[in-house]
Amino acid sequence: TACVIEVNSETDFVAKNETFTSFVEAVNAAALASDLQGGKDGEDIEALLAVPFEGATVKDALVEKTATIGEKLSIRRFEKVAGDVAVSYIHGGGRIGVIVAANGASDDAAREALTNIAMQVAAMNPTYISRNDISAEELAKLQEITVDAALNDPASLPKPILNKLIDKAMNSSAWSDED
């Protein structure tokens, strides 16, 4: 099982502060140890804020750290994944976090493969995992944007090239369909 949490501060200066980063790591550990699954809606965050933490709750600690650091801190979202092997990848000094899990293998090769996938996801920042996850409305919107851009091109692209551009636009929104 792995967990990733987004705790926001008002400035990058605070986000690089050892007190802040230690706090985020500790809250992440508390979230991981809890029965919560994660999310970004109000109920999930409220449940996380109620989790026991260092003799109080996560909410109490958040208020205390806000006072200590002198900047408003907030928990925006968190996610947990479970599998035979789970890895996390943090990039950009904590600005990007990815967690990936898989079942069926738990050896070093599986861990390395998942780490590589997590790094790729962090680099691509896909909106979807697969084209199958893209709603019909979003697909239509992507097609419309691509067609409009192509039609405004003075070269007036032939239909086969236009279709390839549409495919490329959709693939760039989904991680597993990348070439």
Model regions: which residues?
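N-terminal assembly/interaction segments in proteins that build large macromolecular machines
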Residues: 1-179
